[in-house]
Curated annotation (Swiss-Prot):
Keywords: Amino-acid biosynthesis, Histidine biosynthesis, Hydrolase, Methionine biosynthesis, Multifunctional enzyme, NADP, One-carbon metabolism, Oxidoreductase, Purine biosynthesis. This is Bifunctional protein FolD. Pathway: One-carbon metabolism; tetrahydrofolate interconversion. The gene is folD. Its EC number is 1.5.1.5, 3.5.4.9. It comes from Thermosipho africanus (strain TCF52B).
Length: 271
């Protein structure tokens, strides 16, 4: 069975639009990129369309060199007309920590800044990483998380690690196991899970044999195989478990939350 996230998306969007109606000015999101590849360009175009659907002002700044990236981030961080900054990754020739040193955590709508990740550890985050937050929103919409055995496949700072932290919070109290592609006996571990979150970036990694019946599988993966977008979960897993689709699942909610973060920043800035 596939999990339909459209009602959740509509609910989030309606709440955002209601909050936007109370603002004095239109919130603004600026995306900063450098030497973007075709997939990055495609993503930014889809992000621009999403911003327009939500009624946000949107700009793309393509830097001509790495120094210009840092200069632009500093300027945008100080610009009171800008509420959110999105930085495409990876940025050639630039250390990620150097990027964050020039980016205000209050405008880091992706929740990737070390300050925001640190606050997440204390359960006092302003921005959580959008994809991890999207997974939590979906899970809370379809099941009770407390006491469930959750296996996360993936250990990135954008999904795996922050998601584990969010699920361990006292108000959620899941039992969390974090695995990765080098984990021994991975099928043995996943078969005991009530919930599996596949975020390893490996196409069709999770198979039917790795999943127990009636479990919930959240597919975060986006991979291209023979020109087709596929997830980290093999398609037939939906025959025995509840699975989020790819595309149109986690990514849809992630986009909505990215826009919500821009509005949240605008509210804090008394826009």
């Amino acid at each position: 069975m596939l999990i339909d996230v459209k009602p959740l998306y509509s609910e989030i969007k309606n709440l955002i639009m209601d909050r936007m109606s109370k603002l004095k000015k239109v919130p603004k999101l600026v995306a900063v990129t450098y030497k973007p590849d075709p997939s990055t360009i495609s993503y930014l175009k889809s992000q621009e369309k999403a911003a327009k659907r939500f009624g946000l002002d949107y700009e793309i700044f393509e830097a001509s060199n790495s120094i210009e990236v840092l200069e632009k981030l500093r300027k945008l961080s100080e610009d009171k007309s800008v509420n959110g900054i999105f930085v495409t990754h990876p940025l050639p020739e630039l250390d990620e920590m150097l990027v964050f040193e020039n980016l205000s955590p209050e405008k880091d709508i992706e929740g990737r800044h070390p300050y925001n990740l640190g606050m997440l550890m204390y359960g006092n985050e302003f921005f959580a990483p959008c994809t991890a937050e999207a997974v939590v929103k979906i899970l809370e919409n379809v099941t009770e998380i407390t006491g469930k055995n959750v296996v996360i496949i993936g250990r990135s700072t954008t999904v795996g690690k922050p998601l584990a932290t969010m699920l361990l919070r006292r108000d959620r109290s899941a039992t969390v196991t974090v695995c990765h592609t080098k984990t021994r006996n991975l099928p043995e571990i996943t078969r005991n899970a009530d919930i599996i979150v596949a975020a390893a970036g490996k196409a069709r990694l999770v198979t039917k044999e790795m999943v127990k019946s009636d479990s919930i599988v959240i597919d975060v993966g986006i991979n291209v195989v023979d020109g087709k977008i596929v997830g980290d979960v093999k398609e037939d897993v939906s025959e025995i478990a509840k699975v989020t689709p790819v595309p149109g699942g986690v990514g849809r909610i992630t986009t909505a939350l990215l826009m919500e973060h821009v509005v949240k920043s605008a509210e804090k800035m008394n826009f």
